[in-house]
Amino acid sequence: MDNWEDPNFELRNLRVIDLKKILHESGVSFPVNARKIEYIRMVDRIRKNKLSSGPQHLLSHLQKEENSNTSKASSSEDEIAPKYLYPSSPSKSTKKPHNETEPLLSPQFIDKPSNIETPVKIESPHVSQNNTFQSYSELSPNVETSLTMKTPPAHASTPKFRSHKSHRVAVPMSFMDSSALHTSPAFSERLKLLSSSNNFSPQLRSPKISHRLQTSATSSPLQHKRPFTNVPERVSRDIEFAPLDSARPSESSSPYSEVDSAEEDDELFQNYVLQQTRKESKLWSFIKKVFHDIKYANYRLLHNLRAFPGISAISSSYLVHIFMILLGVVAAIFLALLREKMFTAGFCDSGASGSSASILGISFPSLCRTCPPNAICPSPNYVECKPGYVLYEPWYSSLGFWPSKYCVSDTSREESVNIFREECLSVLRSWNAILHCSNNSSDLLERNMSYNAHPYVADNLNISSDHISFPSKPFALGLLHDTLLERKSPTLGLEMFEDLFKASLAVLSETNEVVMDSKLICYDSWAGIPLRCRLKQQLIKFVWRNKVFLFGILALSGVIFKLINFFRTRSIVAKYLPSASRFCVESLKRQKANYQMSRSQEPVIPLIEMHDILFHGNGPLEQIHMTKATARTLWEAIVERVEQVGSVRTRESEVDGEWTRVWEWVGTNTLDFQTDRSFINTTSPLRE
């Protein structure tokens, strides 16, 4: 809070109570319920008044003295200081006459006493009736807050690292044109006193607040038109004054009497650089450098000419304008001669001589112009475009500079060629669909064959038909030509039709789905063919194209299947053949024992009944899943194994009125009825 008078201090960091304390210590009346931004504005005004407190209104007071014709010339400066030291109300300043509102001397160059109690008036901020966020104090447009403050001495507010010596001193009155003032004797004496007691020159911290001093008729031009040589980086609102350089020439002496020429050139260059930094050029880098040198030379020339009487009155802008006009005239003459040489040389591709030329003493190796792209230049100054391009002449072609004329693509012809191309593709697609899917394609083929005797030959196509293989039936170009000719619009001429047809053929030859030569054309694409026909044709073509591969796959698959089935059947037969054949033998023995005990049954079992008992009638092989072929193979193996037993006889016998093959056990039967009964009730080993 102690360093709030520092211009770099941010007042927003202070609390409201701190702001009120500052206002109270400064003797400023303030509203109690105002917003923080209002307190910040009031404190900011106090800080600005303290920073800018200086001899601001000396000239206004002097002019008031002149207008009132008072004779108070002997009054001291301390007595009149409170009257002009601080600004008055803005509403009153607007009513001053013209001679008071526009002083000849800037009030910022006047001294101010350090310790003087003066009233400081703070203007109310700009308000708007439409702003609903402003307080009551902002809505009163004519409210002015008056406060009385005591300006501390220079050393009181100076930081420790700064010098206590004040830099604000009176401005030398030699910088002002006193001849322009129609003053009283007292006013003239006061000006002489101020000019004789001050020998300092101003240094501005900011170029924006510098004031133009009017030139005196008796003073040297170097004193009032000389720009400041030191501009600090930090921009402030106040003005500081530093002593003049000891090498600066006096008013009565010549500019070159006390200063060396080398030092003066260096000083002039610094002044010129300072002016250029304030007004930066926006031209190209090369042109900027050239203009930089020209303007510096002009600046130095004008400075040297001011030493001669009569010449110093010439304005520098006039010489710059004259120099630029002369430079433009020289450039125009040079361009005119260059244009004439270029037209004489012509185009480089037309056989024109490429010898060197000289313009205003400048030698050029060759001035011939390059022929524009897509153009033919038969003569030095004549341009002819290639087919498919038209000549375009821009607005600057009358000037004769390149590129004056060039060839552009003919958009209307390109559109017509694209229309012909799409129509040719549509016709070829319809013919391709008829050829592949329709049953009435014989008429189209007959028409196509009729053009073989007198074929249409495309001369603009440089395609050899020796190495071209057509994927399908090709069509004659004459058939396509006549088909499009039948569809031609009546407004299209025959010559234009022939030109567009040949151009469309050249475009079609670059299409991937079209294969053609100078006489035949073939469309190799499925576009325009129905889906069902397309799938059928694609499948047939695929099978026919890969028939060898597909046949090999089928044969190999069959062999593999047979081998797998063979080994599987063999494993099943090897697993169940012993138990099944033993079951058949045991069944024959039981049948023989039952026959011997009861004499009521036949001692034989038919093979058909044995097969059913074995595979279906709760036999040992009923729960085994196998194919019919495997079951048949297993039964054949069982029959062969049982017939190899010597005690089993196979014969033909009548069973239930039908003759069939039967098996009979003829060997010794060791089974009796009890064992047979127990055998029947016992679960077969094949079921386990």
From Swiss-Prot:
Keyword Phosphoprotein listed: yes
Segments traversing the membrane: 318-338, 547-567
Q: Where in the cell is it found?
A: Nucleus inner membrane
Q: Where is this region: Disordered?
A: 62-113, 202-227
- Provide ranges: composition bias, Polar residues: 212-222
Q: Which UniProt keywords apply?
A: Meiosis, Membrane, Nucleus, Phosphoprotein, Transmembrane, Transmembrane helix
Q: Which residues carry this modification: Phosphoserine?
A: 684
Q: Where is composition skewed (Low complexity) in this entry?
A: 82-92
Membrane topology term reads: Multi-pass membrane protein
Q: Name one GO cellular component term.
A: chromosome, centromeric core domain
Changes seen on gene knockout: Modest growth deficit. Suppresses slow growth rates of spores and severe nuclear envelope (NE) morphology defects of vps4 mutants.
Molecular function in Gene Ontology: centromere-nuclear envelope anchor activity; centromeric DNA binding; chromatin binding; double-stranded DNA binding; heterochromatin-nuclear membrane anchor activity
Q: What does this protein do?
A: Nucleus inner membrane protein involved in meiosis. Plays a role in regulating nuclear envelope (NE) morphology and nuclear integrity, particularly during spindle pole body (SPB) extrusion or insertion through the NE, and perhaps during karyokinesis.
Supply the name of the protein. Answer: Lap-Emerin-Man domain protein 2
